[in-house]
Swiss-Prot record:
Keywords: Isomerase, Magnesium, Metal-binding, Phosphoprotein
Pfam families for the chain: PGM_PMM_I, PGM_PMM_II, PGM_PMM_III, PGM_PMM_IV
PROSITE patterns documented for this protein: PGM_PMM
PTM info: Activated by phosphorylation.
Gene from which this protein is expressed: glmM
Name of protein: Phosphoglucosamine mutase
Modified residues (Phosphoserine): S100
GO molecular function: magnesium ion binding; phosphoglucosamine mutase activity; phosphomannomutase activity
Reactions it catalyzes: alpha-D-glucosamine 1-phosphate = D-glucosamine 6-phosphate
Protein residues bound to Mg(2+): S100, D239, D241, D243
EC number: 5.4.2.10
Database matches in InterPro entries: A-D-PHexomutase_a/b/a-I, A-D-PHexomutase_a/b/a-I/II/III, A-D-PHexomutase_a/b/a-II, A-D-PHexomutase_a/b/a-III, A-D-PHexomutase_C, A-D-PHexomutase_C_sf, A-D-PHexomutase_CS, Alpha-D-phosphohexomutase_SF
Length: 446
């Protein structure tokens, strides 16, 4: 990670860390790096529903226009919508203004290349290098200054594409949706209405301040109650920018990203669409996920935590399904990033094709109890290479055998070591996690 770019673009508290001045620079230098080979580059901009979106869009727009770009404003749209439309309209770049599932105070700016994929590390480094130096970029004048046009119908083009990924309608299926008062608030309602589902919605009345506030994929409790109250067949919870999906079965039980991936992987395998019989996930996926795949003869590849690492593995090795327990699920045959609405219609389509309720599909994967504990340390990297810790982890893994697992990893942002244990019972998880935590605190703690 660089000075400005993190694991998912540039993020910060809007008007403090992520200021209009910084947004202008990102537009000017980011736009230049992505479009320097084009005489009149076309760049798409989308945003979520945060109150700071207009402010940052205006500043970003000014930066892009200052390098002579033709900017197409998409208005409120999901992150995957921007990624899809960037490629579909042959634009030179796309930009999304969102902080995903973060609170309303935060915002972010994320770029996509002409292929619809996020930027490479090399591209981000080039942008940062220009931002930290003297501004010697060309400054067009007169008719060469950039122009801006609205392309609000882009959202409908994106929805039409999503519908074309399946052959069924959803007539007679009762669907409850929670849009986190975010980017999918209008889009998801239109999508499922067009597919003839019976829709009930919550979290679909954004006011600029209520995004992710008690609703959406990181707060599914209200949706669980709503599904039972409305006697719905399925609940679908999206996050603020629409790149995640967490589902709820007809009984009100959570169906997380692991279960959604398993359900879709099994169906794709049965119809011959799962490439190399493999699903890509992160090390945080539940042990039950791996065992369920193994039981039906499928393989799994593990990556570090983060959807960018899942995507790298998929692209490098030709896989077409991957994701995270948190609900980032990538169907690479269709789109170049995680997409909550695409994941949702693929999941509902499996219900339609199999005739099975979601609870029955989800119950084929048995979730192992899991405990996650954080321990503050002096040096997290030194702690992870400590022989005393490695010996204790090895001892616990031998005792667990194939009925559990241990994962010890550093926090990405704090001086913490995270200890995750999965086992057959919650009591075993607690017992083994406490053993490892005790060793860290005694020998390596802050």
């Amino acid at each position: 990670m660089g000075k400005f770019f993190g694991t998912d673009g540039v993020r910060g508290v809007a008007n403090e860390g992520l200021t209009p001045e910084l947004a202008f620079k990102l537009g000017r230098f980011g736009g230049y790096v992505l479009t320097k080979d084009s005489e009149r580059p076309r760049i798409l901009i989308g945003r979520d529903t945060r109150v700071s979106g207009h402010m940052l869009e205006g500043a970003l727009l000014a930066g892009l226009l200052s390098i002579g770009a033709e900017v197409m404003r998409l208005g409120v749209i999901s992150t995957p919508g921007v990624a899809y439309l960037t490629k579909a309209t042959s634009a030179q770049a796309g930009v999304m203004i969102s902080a995903s599932h973060n609170p309303v105070e935060d915002n972010g700016i994320k770029f996509f290349g002409p292929d619809g994929f996020k930027l490479t590390d090399a591209q981000e480094n080039e942008i940062e290098s220009l931002m930290e130096g003297e501004d010697n970029l060309p400054r067009p004048t007169g008719a060469d200054i950039g122009v801006v046009n609205d392309y609000f119908e882009g959202g409908q083009k994106y929805l039409s594409y999503l519908k074309d990924t399946i052959d069924n309608d959803f007539e007679g299926i009762h669907i409850a949706i929670d849009c986190a008062n975010g980017a999918t608030s209008s889009l998801a309602t239109h999508l499922f209405a067009d597919l003839e589902a019976d829709i009930y919605s919550i979290g679909s009345s954004p006011d600029g301040l209520n995004i992710n506030d008690g609703f959406g994929s990181t707060h599914p409790e209200k949706l669980q109650e709503f599904v039972v109250e409305k006697n719905a067949d399925i609940g679908l919870a999206f996050d603020g920018d629409g790149d995640r999906l967490i589902a709820v079965d007809e009984k009100g039980n959570l169906v997380d990203g692991d279960k959604i991936m398993f359900i879709c992987a099994k169906y794709m395998h049965e119809i011959g669409m799962l490439r190399k019989d493999t699903v890509v996930s992160t090390v945080m996926s539940n042990l039950g996920f791996y065992k369920a795949l193994e039981n039906i003869g499928l393989n799994s590849n593990k990556t570090s935590v983060g959807d960018r690492y899942v995507m790298e593995e998929m692209r490098q090795n030709g896989y077409n399904l991957g994701g995270e327990q948190s609900g980032h699920i990538i169907f690479l045959d269709y789109i170049t990033t995680g997409d909550g609405m695409l994941s949702a219609i693929q999941l509902v389509n499996v219900m339609r094709e199999t005739g099975k309720p979601l609870s029955e599909l989800a119950d084929e994967m048995v979730v192992f109890p899991q405990v996650l504990k954080n321990v503050r340390v002096m040096d997290k990297n030194q702690a992870l290479s400590s022989s005393v810790l490695l010996d204790e982890v090895d001892a616990v893994e031998k005792e667990l055998g194939e009925d559990g697992r241990v994962l010890v990893r550093p926090s990405g942002t704090e001086p913490l070591v995270r200890v995750m244990v999965e086992a057959k019972t919650k009591e075993e998880c607690e017992q083994y996690a406490d053993r490892i935590v005790s060793v860290i605190e005694q020998h390596l703690g802050a």
